[in-house]
Amino acid sequence: SDEDSVRIHQSPVDLGSVKPQIAMASKLKDLGFHAVMTGDGADELFGGYRRAEQYDSQYSDVFCELPYYHLPKLDRTMMYYTVELRSPFLAPSVVKHALDLPYEMRKGIKQKLIDEFAYLLPTEILERQKHPLKTDSIRKDPMSQRIANNEIWKNL
């Protein structure tokens, strides 16, 4: 719920992205998982975006937004449910290696890896399209507005 979002993060957050994180973390805990691996940083480091104009935003994502906004938010959510988050693509050795490669070498490596290991993956995974998270804007969500306007924020 939206109240869970505020309790976990102890501040107003982008409820559109936190709601699915809470649902995922809760389900993982219910299934008995104690740790999960993410692909965070892989697209940014290895040119996983299809459009060339997204390349400029990749630097900002890896060095500005991921470590200071996205990952802490996700980590707080996961740890609330006692599930450890591991991001192997953001290990210092992987980041250094990726940045040492010329961009042309990194571009498209994701598809090369998929092609190489396709025999290990189910068809529904191989053929699944990547979709951005789509949620209602906070301005349109009455529950989000109720939380945002709550008296509790005036005392912080």
Question: Where do the protein language model's features map onto the residues?
Answer:
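Adenosyl-5′-phosphate
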Residues: 32-38, 44, 56-156
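ATP-dependent adenylate-handling ligase core
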Residues: 1-31, 51-56, 100-105
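Short, solvent-exposed loop/turn and secondary-structure capping segments
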Residues: 47-49
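Short beta->alpha linker loops
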Residues: 19, 40-41
